[in-house]
Amino acid sequence: MGKTANSPGSGARPDPVRSFNRWKKKHSHRQNKKKQLRKQLKKPEWQVERESISRLMQNYEKINVNEITRFSDFPLSKKTLKGLQEAQYRLVTEIQKQTIGLALQGKDVLGAAKTGSGKTLAFLVPVLEALYRLQWTSTDGLGVLIISPTRELAYQTFEVLRKVGKNHDFSAGLIIGGKDLKHEAERINNINILVCTPGRLLQHMDETVSFHATDLQMLVLDEADRILDMGFADTMNAVIENLPKKRQTLLFSATQTKSVKDLARLSLKNPEYVWVHEKAKYSTPATLEQNYIVCELQQKISVLYSFLRSHLKKKSIVFFSSCKEVQYLYRVFCRLRPGVSILALHGRQQQMRRMEVYNEFVRKRAAVLFATDIAARGLDFPAVNWVLQFDCPEDANTYIHRAGRTARYKEDGEALLILLPSEKAMVQQLLQKKVPVKEIKINPEKLIDVQKKLESILAQDQDLKERAQRCFVSYVRSVYLMKDKEVFDVSKLPIPEYALSLGLAVAPRVRFLQKMQKQPTKELVRSQADKVIEPRAPSLTNDEVEEFRAYFNEKMSILQKGGKRLEGTEHRQDNDTGNEEQEEEEDDEEEMEEKLAKAKGSQAPSLPNTSEAQKIKEVPTQFLDRDEEEEDADFLKVKRHNVFGLDLKDEKTLQKKEPSKSSIKKKMTKVAEAKKVMKRNFKVNKKITFTDEGELVQQWPQMQKSAIKDAEEDDDTGGINLHKAKERLQEEDKFDKEEYRKKIKAKHREKRLKEREARREANKRQAKAKDEEEAFLDWSDDDDDDDDGFDPSTLPDPDKYRSSEDSDSEDMENKISDTKKKQGMKKRSNSEVEDVGPTSHNRKKARWDTLEPLDTGLSLAEDEELVLHLLRSQS
């Protein structure tokens, strides 16, 4: 076999393309083998993620708080760090530095720090990392529960969570009041992180069947001291009962609770207490300047208006104690127009309106927000310059949270507290809480009085006047219900002056205030009576009894002049009835003591003249004079010690056996009372109106009177007898049907009369028109030569045609009368007049087209004149 041309022995060069293709094929085969080997050696993503999680968990114990300055110094997942960087969170605060590491290790944490120190991120970062470690998905259900006291704070927390955790695959939801419950119930099962308020959460636990929290991993209470307060106590107890005990719990607040009872409710296990600023000099931010002023209650509105006028380019929050105050003052200040935008935020607003106000105040650079304490906790409003506390807070903790809305995270801010002269004790409480407040004075030259303007506004607007009255009552009630009576004393408030400052002419009536004012006098009377009635010895002589009687009469007359009423009077107020019953029980006890003492053979020391007392008791009270009755009551009200040590249980049982007067009286039902009033035949006032023509205008339809007299009018039994009512209705139905038949007959008769009258009128009109009807024919202008008019001598002899026209004229008259009746007195046309001629008796069968016309040799006008002449001659 010979050698080829491309063989090496032939001396020819090898083909480079062929050799390159051969090399490329070998190289690609080698690379594919390497890729397959690399794929076999490569781990799946879930396994790599688990290994990274295990490495992070190993680094949790190595966290050194002193070395941490950034979030990247913590062993956090890449998704969390990326979310923090995108949200511009890089440096950590003190509370974040000390609590995030403990929370990552799975410990229960109680964190407390100043307002604006970053507590929200301190619990959101551990929340994201806890679910990331467990590889939590939407199908796993609820994993973390974050509870906030207010809707606005929950909304703010949810927005921060969206920014920080947007790179994770968790689902988060906001459950607050004011939203659609069904819409929330449809999506609540797929939520991993739930931010909510206590009330709506409990509602879903009770009403949403598929909602459960059995797999809950972490519970977070934001503003924990407020949530664990008495206001949320019942709700939180019910919520905690539905949560598993094996969970991690985080509590954060600016004023943290240390109550063992509250912490025991949450089932905390070895919690870590983190009080960042516990050893600090002040409990408020160092950049916050705090002052207070003292002014009278009637000057507070003028002070507020003057403050707003002098801070037009500032962003301020004004706190009030009640919603109705915010509602009234917001509307009034909008009418006063201080020169700055005013917003209102309170609990009585709809949820969507509250969100709009919150977002609008965040956007504005210069505005004033009138708010209640729902905005006092947790809300982070940017660049707030002033916090003005119009009403004194209930305690120092509330003041700290209110003032914390400004000076957020190393920014400057100012806080002003307005106190009444009776509320100066609050300053000492603030100093005890390490709150540095200084007193400043009001410049009277810059104070603008707005009382006259308010009076004029209320005089024009009735709705605003009613709001002012509700504002007045609401403020007085809030002061009255405050727990700290050393600071809040409603009796020291200048009530009439405060009403005038609101623009009201007269102070509204406050019922609870009137009752409160009566209580001191009763206590004084009771104390004086106790002092007077104290016995001097266990046994008394007759002379001593007489002296005591005169002394009692004198004292009781003085007390009665001061407002005390006698025992015999009825229908007292609630507080008076309690005192009266107590005094009557004491009298009965004394009488029982005397009877028991007689039974034992000993004489009662309180009544030496028992025969006289017995005679007095036997006389009916209605026959006694007023003086004797008072004297008897005064004497029997002598309070004695239980000398014999008798048991009072027997006395109370005897008192219970005696029937009271109220139980003896027969109860009067509403039906009996109504019948009793009807029997008296009271004449009710009636308003009678007339039209311009003098006709009576009936405002109400007449009441249908029963045709059957009720046989049991005097029956006082309550309720309705259905059987008798059914029989009564059946009898009434017969009369109703008869009345209906009469009405229908009268209606038909009236209709017939109207139709008959109409026919008569029509006949009269027809007869009148027939009498007045007259035909006018124009003269012909054909003969121009005859200027003198028509010549009667040219007419033919009328006697020639008289005999033949006698019968036809009668038929013609009948036809004309019939056509007039049918066509409404319409004039005949010229064609009908032309067709008049000798015809047969049967006009219907006659054929008009076969008849030959009568040729008189005259013109048309002359023929018409002839016909008219003939008709007149017949008549």
Curated annotation (Swiss-Prot):
GO molecular function: ATP binding; ATP hydrolysis activity; RNA binding; RNA helicase activity
Region annotation Disordered: where it falls in the sequence: 1-43, 562-631, 703-850
EC code: 3.6.4.13
Keyword line: Acetylation, ATP-binding, Cytoplasm, Helicase, Hydrolase, Isopeptide bond, Nucleotide-binding, Nucleus, Phosphoprotein, RNA-binding, Ubl conjugation
Span of domain Helicase C-terminal: 287-448
Localization annotation: Cytoplasm; Nucleus; Nucleus, Nucleolus
Motif placement: Q motif: 69-97
Domain Helicase ATP-binding stretches: 100-274
Linked residues for Glycyl lysine isopeptide (Lys-Gly) (interchain with G-Cter in SUMO2): 649
CDD domains in UniProt: DEADc_DDX10 (cd17941), SF2_C_DEAD (cd18787)
Keyword Nucleotide-binding applies: yes
Swiss-Prot/TrEMBL catalytic activity: ATP + H2O = ADP + phosphate + H(+)
Biased composition (Basic and acidic residues): 564-575, 727-741, 752-771, 812-821
Protein family (similarity comment): Belongs to the DEAD box helicase family. DDX10/DBP4 subfamily.
Protein name, per record: Probable ATP-dependent RNA helicase DDX10
Organism whose genome encodes this protein: Homo sapiens
Upper classification of the organism: Eukaryota, Metazoa, Chordata, Craniata, Vertebrata
